[in-house]
């Protein structure tokens, strides 16, 4: 724990297993050879930004306690196709610049999901909001999703508010996340958005294999020359 706005930095030659921790400033954690995990249901509370990095190929980051409280942006960095990352925030989740070699699972229990830095995700990515009518805004211009992306409203049983999504390649609306480029809006009705929908494919096409039901405005942008 730190007092006031003090920062916390930890680097371990092996893995890191967090007990319950409170950091008033920023947290920077690097595991050189192992995984980064949390002990049981003990939560991390970080007022500033949080950066978690595994240096070994295929090492994971698993921050899956539902009472984690990350007030600032959370950055996740792994290497190797088996280097997966999972993060849960008890309220809203803001993802900072992150590079994940495997899959990414990001969940906000009571708030929205957004990103304040570019996301480069090699494996499949799932973004889940549990609160009905919550928003997902993945709008950084340098986002690179190399595999399929699922936007999930509480396990597919609730409705979204607004969705903003930017990818460097093509985007294909689909009823599942089975192929590279698929964007699966998994709500109470698949493809349904209760607010506004904005999707940008900076270098590819935008296509669909599932009907979209958008209550608000819809904006589709392709940036390729």
Regions found by a protein language model. Give the residues of each.
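Extracellular lectin-like interaction modules
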Residues: 1-225
């Amino acid at each position: 724990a730190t007092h006031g706005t003090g920062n916390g930095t930890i680097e371990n030659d092996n893995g890191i297993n967090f007990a319950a921790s409170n950091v008033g400033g920023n947290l920077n954690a690097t595991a050189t050879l192992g995984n980064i995990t949390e002990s049981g249901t003990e939560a991390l509370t970080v007022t500033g930004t949080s950066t978690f990095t595994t240096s070994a190929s295929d090492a994971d980051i698993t921050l899956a306690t539902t009472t984690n409280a990350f007030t600032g942006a959370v950055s996740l960095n792994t290497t190797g196709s088996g280097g997966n990352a999972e993060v849960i925030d008890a309220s809203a989740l803001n993802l900072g610049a992150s590079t994940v070699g495997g899959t990414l699972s990001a969940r906000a229990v009571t708030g929205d999901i957004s990103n304040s830095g570019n996301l480069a995700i090699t494996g499949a990515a799932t973004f889940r909001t549990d609160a009905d009518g919550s928003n997902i805004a993945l709008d950084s211009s340098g986002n690179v999703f190399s595999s399929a992306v699922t936007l999930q409203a509480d396990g597919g049983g609730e409705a979204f508010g607004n969705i903003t999504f930017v990818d460097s390649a093509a985007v294909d609306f689909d009823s599942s996340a089975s192929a590279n480029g698929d964007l699966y809006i998994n709500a109470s009705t698949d493809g349904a958005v209760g607010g506004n929908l904005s999707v940008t494919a900076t270098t590819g096409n935008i296509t669909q294999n599932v009907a979209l039901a958008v209550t608000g405005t819809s904006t589709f942008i392709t940036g390729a020359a």
